């Protein structure tokens, strides 16, 4: 099968995408597929460079990768691709929309407000949420332009920074607890990972630098494990996920809260999904092969 590895892109996460793409190429080549690296520098590249491939493995992140755009283009070209469809991708990229759906479905998530300019910052609403808060681009990833703000004085500057990366900014209550991630493959949860960043939170450096954080497989207490699994599965169903996603949570006082869903989890050597799969004996090559297999089974 002729598989195009689509990577690069136009978002702030381009370098992460290129790293993911290189790793995917290295391991998919072991499975005797014909691999074609497709580096995207502008949106129009997909229409031209994807011609002739049998399957597109998406190693993109952020804008044009995780927001449903490239998925729609590939469907128009009748090229099957990895991961979730356009609607789920677009919704999960929009943190505000995701949290509204989670709240409607009675799935725990931290309180938040969104703003689109410095002028419409509602300081009273933020006070009700309670400091400290995370200020971050509504549609960003990899913790780019994300800041932990401990009082009112720091809000304006953090919002201004986040607005450089997105037209909308989320201000979310900082729920202090243990951060965990649940990797979902074809609707089933792989072993849970605990994320223990060496910085104050799981920022860009902690995510992608060697030694930036410790990510370890953990055995949750039975009742908590059941709650976490039920919540991850509820997210999968409510947001109509397909093939694979990563559900990030915080556990505080034995109660899990969903942070966000990642529809195209990173595939670098430091990435969480391969670590979780490896804990049940699924090698990186086998994981990639499963993603291709399950993606081909989805009716688009």
From Swiss-Prot:
UniProt catalytic activity? 2 D-alanine + ATP = D-alanyl-D-alanine + ADP + phosphate + H(+)
Q: Which cofactor does it need?
A: Mg(2+); Mn(2+)
Sequence positions that bind Mg(2+) 2: 260, 262
Q: Which GO terms describe its biological process?
A: cell wall organization; peptidoglycan biosynthetic process; regulation of cell shape
Pathway assigned to this chain's UniProt record? Cell wall biogenesis; peptidoglycan biosynthesis
Residues binding ATP are: 126-181
State the EC number(s): 6.3.2.4
How is this protein annotated for GO cellular component?
A: cytoplasm
Describe the location of the ATP-grasp domain by residue ranges.
Answer: 99-293
Q: Which positions in this protein are listed as binding Mg(2+) 1?
A: 248, 260
Compartments, as annotated in UniProt? Cytoplasm
Q: Which GO terms describe its molecular function?
A: ATP binding; D-alanine-D-alanine ligase activity; metal ion binding
PROSITE patterns in alphabetical order: ATP_GRASP, DALA_DALA_LIGASE_1, DALA_DALA_LIGASE_2
Q: How is the cofactor bound?
A: Binds 2 magnesium or manganese ions per subunit.
Tell me which UniProt keywords the record has, alphabetically: ATP-binding, Cell shape, Cell wall biogenesis/degradation, Cytoplasm, Ligase, Magnesium, Manganese, Metal-binding, Nucleotide-binding, Peptidoglycan synthesis
Q: What's a Pfam family in this record?
A: Dala_Dala_lig_C
Where is it chiefly localized? cytoplasm
Task: Give the family from UniProt.
Answer: Belongs to the D-alanine--D-alanine ligase family.
Instruction: Describe the task this protein carries out.
Output: Cell wall formation.
This protein is called D-alanine--D-alanine ligase
Gene behind this protein: ddl
């Amino acid at each position: 099968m002729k598989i195009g590895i689509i990577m690069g892109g136009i978002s702030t996460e381009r370098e992460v995408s290129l790293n993911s793409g290189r790793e995917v190429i290295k391991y998919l080549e072991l499975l005797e597929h014909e691999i074609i690296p497709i580096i995207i520098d502008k949106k129009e590249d997909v229409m031209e460079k994807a011609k002739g491939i049998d399957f597109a493995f998406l190693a993109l992140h952020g804008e044009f990768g995780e927001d449903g755009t490239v998925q729609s283009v590939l469907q128009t070209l009748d090229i099957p691709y990895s991961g979730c469809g356009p609607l789920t991708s677009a919704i999960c990229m929009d943190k505000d929309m995701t949290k509204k759906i989670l709240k409607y479905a009675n799935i725990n998530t931290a309180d938040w407000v969104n703003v689109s300019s410095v002028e419409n910052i509602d300081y009273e609403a933020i006070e009700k949420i309670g400091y400290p808060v995370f200020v971050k681009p509504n549609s960003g990833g990899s913790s780019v332009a994300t800041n932990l703000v401990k009082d009112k004085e720091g809000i304006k500057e953090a919002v201004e920074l986040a607005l450089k990366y997105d037209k909308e900014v989320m201000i979310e209550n900082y729920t202090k607890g243990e951060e965990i991630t649940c990797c979902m493959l074809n609707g089933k949860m792989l072993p849970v990972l605990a994320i223990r960043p060496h910085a104050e939170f799981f920022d860009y450096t902690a995510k992608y630098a060697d030694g930036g954080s410790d990510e370890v497989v953990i055995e949750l207490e039975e009742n908590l494990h059941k709650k976490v699994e039920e919540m991850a599965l509820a997210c999968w169903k409510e947001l109509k996920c397909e093939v694979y996603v990563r559900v990030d949570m915080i556990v505080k006082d034995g109660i899990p809260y969903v942070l966000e869903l990642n529809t195209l989890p990173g595939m670098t050597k430091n990435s969480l999904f391969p670590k979780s799969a490896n804990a049940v004996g699924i090698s990186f090559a086998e994981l990639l092969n499963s993603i291709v297999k399950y993606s081909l089974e989805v009716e688009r």
